[in-house]
Amino acid sequence: MEVRDINVFELTIELMKIPSVSGNEQKVGAFIGEYLGSLGYDVELQEVVDGRKNVIAVASDNPELFFSTHMDTVPPFIPPTEDREKIYGRGSCDAKGIIASQIAAAEQLRAAGETRIGLLFTVDEEESSLGSKAANDLPVSAKCRYMINGEPTDNDLGIGSKGSLRMRLSTSGKAAHSAYPEMGESAIEKMVEVLSDVIGADLPGDEFFGDTTLNVGTISGGLKTNVVPPSAEAGLHIRLATDDGPVIERLNEIVGDRGELETMSCSLPVKMLEVEGFKQKVVRFTTDIPQLTNWGTPLLLGPGSILDAHTSHEYVKKEDLVAAVELYVNLGRRLLDGQVKRHR
């Protein structure tokens, strides 16, 4: 089995050149699968939906440690550029720089004789986590003792991540000619009133995870400016610091009979392993980890800042990519050698 010294900058840029907005991960998945196969890994491409495939690669038949992250990005595609210090463009920190760092770390471990390793790269993390949900049923998951999931954490160890609750709020009215608004009922005016109360709501929080926060991400409604709007809809994204039950109950109390709330998707907050010697923090975002319950004990670590992800100026520092490789190798060795004790 060939072992390579991976140039993490070059690999990051090669991955970024391949557009992979959620729903279109086919080409980047094929590239990664072929690349890992050329290194001698046993590669499986797991069909998820519409030709979109997870990539699973193992260095032996006893993969106790997996590195994992996602291949999809948010829109729009932004081609890569670089200077001496940074790599810019879509996926630089979320999460193609992480893919490159994890592959480079796996190769360093193999070069040192460690073969109890695997790699899992999923589709659809930025949407509904269809990839991780499908991966959770793979038989190889039973062999995994530890999974290091990669997201931009500033190379700090994430010891907790908030949950994610997506909801749809709908209001109904009665259409009428806009010259006679008293003959109708405006669903948009009703929506504005309800959202004002929802945005100002005091939602249940948690001492460990912090506050539960709410974002109104989308609003739509109405037919034309000369028609009293009969319907309106808003998309809510709540970052959960608690179980979803108390939050949904509180929101239903606020909305009352003025509208309808529907849960679109939900993943709960997760506490993860604490490891001595690493900078540690709780992150506000969610990951694939809640869907990968069969993949051993989860850890969260990756280069780049979540504040730069999903932006027009997305970038990752080259020094952070190099540091991430070293951190992944160090953490992987300690986990495989039994040098990490569970704190939570």
PLM regions: where:
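Acidic-glycine-rich active-site phosphate/pyrophosphate-binding loop
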Residues: 71-83, 143-144, 159-170
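Metal-dependent amide/peptide-bond hydrolase catalytic core
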Residues: 3, 20, 27, 152, ...
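Acidic/His- and Gly-rich active-site-bordering loop/insert found
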Residues: 1-91, 114, 300
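Structural motif corresponding to alpha-helix initiation and N-cap regions
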Residues: 51-52, 129, 285-286
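Acidic/histidine-rich catalytic neighborhood of metal-dependent amide-processing enzymes
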Residues: 100-166, 206-207
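Residue-level marker for buried hydrophobic side chains located in beta-strands
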Residues: 65-67, 148, 174
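Alpha-helical metal-binding/catalytic segments enriched in His/Glu/Asp
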Residues: 67, 84-129, 167-171, 181-201, ...
